[in-house]
Structure formats: structure tokens, C-alpha cells
Amino acid sequence: MIERYLENYAEPEARAVGGAHAAPANLNGRPLRDTRVWQGCLVIPAFNEAFETLHRQLTSMRSADVLVILVINAPENANPKAIADTRMLLYKIHEQDYEHVIVVDRASNGLRLNPKQGVGLARKIGCDLALALRLAGRARSDWLLQSDADVFFPSGYSDLLHTIPVTDSAGARIFPHNHFSSDPTLHYAGQLYDQHMSYYVAGLAMAGSRYAHHSLGSTIAVHAKTYAAVRGYPKRSAGEDFYLLNKICKLAPVERLAGPALSIEARISARVPFGTGPALRKIVENLAKDPSGDSYLSYHPDCFRLLGRALRALDRWAVAPQNPLQGNLLGRLSALGFDGFADGLSKQQTTAEQRHRSVHDWFDGLKTLQFIRACQDIYGDQSLTHTLANLESAFRTKVFEFQTNNG
């Protein structure tokens, strides 16, 4: 499976490393010039990052027996200053000649990324390269660690690389995390965002969704065979982590690790059109008007209760498809394409177990999010802090279970 993926779907850097030819000119680093075998690989994309921050991060991994694949990149349409700063970063990183880092240049002229593919392509380049090195025997572990330049790695971060999965389809693992900042307002914004995301994931879990997990690229580890099976990272300028895990969930487990927790610097960023950076910007703007944070809104709990009803209705349909869905739920699921899905499946000979799997593959993480957002038309958003303070005990316990903010 891995060989087939690398041959047919991998990016050029990985195919070159896996072949008999010399490494392409945009790859550099001492590990390319020796034969050391590492415990595992860690992939970090970097665009318009400060050298000091990245140097500190890379240095912290020096004794971990981890080969870091650093993909220094810039989209073709980035502003000239960001491109110039990223190229200067590339120059400074090259000067260090780290013994444990391979640098991929996707920031120089002729090498920059398609803006529509952005960070998704950057992650894919790095992970494809890690996969090729694993196949070539340069790494022992099947786990591919992924992170970002704003993460502080705790002691024990690389311990996962020493574990042996029970099955080849081991899926993905999610590290717990919390956002922090030396700026009090930004720190509080990071806390609110972590609470919002933990509340959302807990709501999915309460509803019985199998897509109840965080989707943050800097906190993911993917098993090599699983990564190949889903054909790697989607080439997207944002949301690549969400879509990768959405694909993995249909094939293998996505599990949250008990620890260690990653500390992620809360940063207002315009690198991507949506995600953590833009969300933090909106929260900071909100805090300027209401420093208490009470006016920061999140989903109404009844959205998740309605999701639970929908999932139970789909389970009943899988057992007895001759009994059609009815009422408001049918309308909401039809708006997501359920009628076409059910009609297509009805033309096949299927068992209840097969229908159950198919319907939950169809009603995936993306459709779940779309369903929750559609519920906002009847259950308006409300204060996150007030919601968390007034949740029933079981729901509050579940939020605590998924809580990423350690204070």
C-alpha cells in the first residue's frame, strides 16, 4: 500500500528520495548525507515565521532521536515582504546545518505553492517525504508526527514513536493541547477558543457521533499505512487537518491521547482564510468591547441534542430502511443530500450492518458540522461562558473530558 501510494500519489520530493537518483535541489540537510536511522519523523510547515522561535523549537528536539522535516514555504500570491522574510528564514535555517533536520525549500522562485493548495500541500510534501524515508528504513516508527512552528514540545512528546500499534490500520492520534500567550487579552482569547472547541467536540460525543475529536494540524500523529490509505493530506489552503481526519475516521480509529499536552502560542494570523488565527482575531475584537468574555457566543446545547436525535434516526433507518424518516429531521437530512444517498444505497443488496456503516460514512464530520450550523436557525447561539456554567452534569463532565485548556 505504501509503495503504491508513493509511486502514484506522492509529491516529487518523496518520489526522488525513494528512488535511485540524487535528492532534488530543493532538499537540504545533513540527514540526506548520512545513513543514520531515526526513531521517527516530525513534519513542520513554516511560512513567515520568526527564526528565533523556530530555532528554539528545532533545538528542543535535538536529542529526541527524531528526524524533523521542515517545509519552508510560501504561496505564490503572498505579499512581497512575507516572501522575503520567509526566504531570509530559509537562509538562516540553512546556516545552522542542524544534524536532525531536512529542509524542504518551497519558498524560492519557481518553487512556491499554489495558493489554493497552501498549507495542505506543505504538510503533504513533508509527510510524503517522511513516508518515503520510513519505507527506505531511515525511520523505525510507523507514526508520522505533525506539528507547527508555534508549538512548544513537552517532555515525552516523542514517546508515541516507541509504541507499536496493535493493527496496521492504527488510524490517528490527537495530542491534548492548550493555547497560551504572554499578552493577557490574547491568552484569554486562546482560553475561550479552546473552551469553544472542547464544547463542540463534547457535544458531538454526547450525541453519539464517531467524529468527536479535535482537528488541529499541530496536534496530530498519523500511522503510515493509514496515511497512505487515505492518499495523504488534502491540498487545501485551510482545513486540511479537518479533512484528513474526516477521511481517516471512515477507515480507522482517531483517538485522543491522555498526554502529554502541547502548548501552542495563541497568534492572530492571516495565513489561512479560516481556522485558529482568524478565530482568535474575532475573539480579541469581541473582548475589546466586552472584556468579561461573556458576549462570546457558541452553539446552543439543543443543537447537539437534535444531532443525537438525527443519529438515532439514521441508526433506525439502517435497520429498517422501509420505514422512512419523517418530520423536521427528514427535512434537515434531505437538505444535506440524504435522499440521494438512500436512493443509491437502495439499489444495492446490503445488510443492516453495511447500511449502518455507509450512513455514518455519509453523515461524516463535514455533514455533522453543516447540520449543527443549520440548527442555528431555530437554536440561536448563546454565551459560551453561561452555557458551560449551566450544562447538565453529564454534558459538563464530557466537556471537561475533552477540555484542552489546562489553565
Question: Model-predicted segments: where are they?
Answer:
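Terminal low-complexity segments of carbohydrate-biosynthetic enzymes
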Residues: 1-3, 282-407
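Short beta-strand-to-loop element that shapes/binds the nucleotide-sugar donor at the catalytic cleft/hinge
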Residues: 169-189
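Catalytic donor-sugar/metal-binding loop of nucleotide-sugar-dependent glycosyltransferases
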Residues: 236, 248-263
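Acidic donor-binding loop at a coil-to-helix junction in glycosyltransferase catalytic cores
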Residues: 236-243
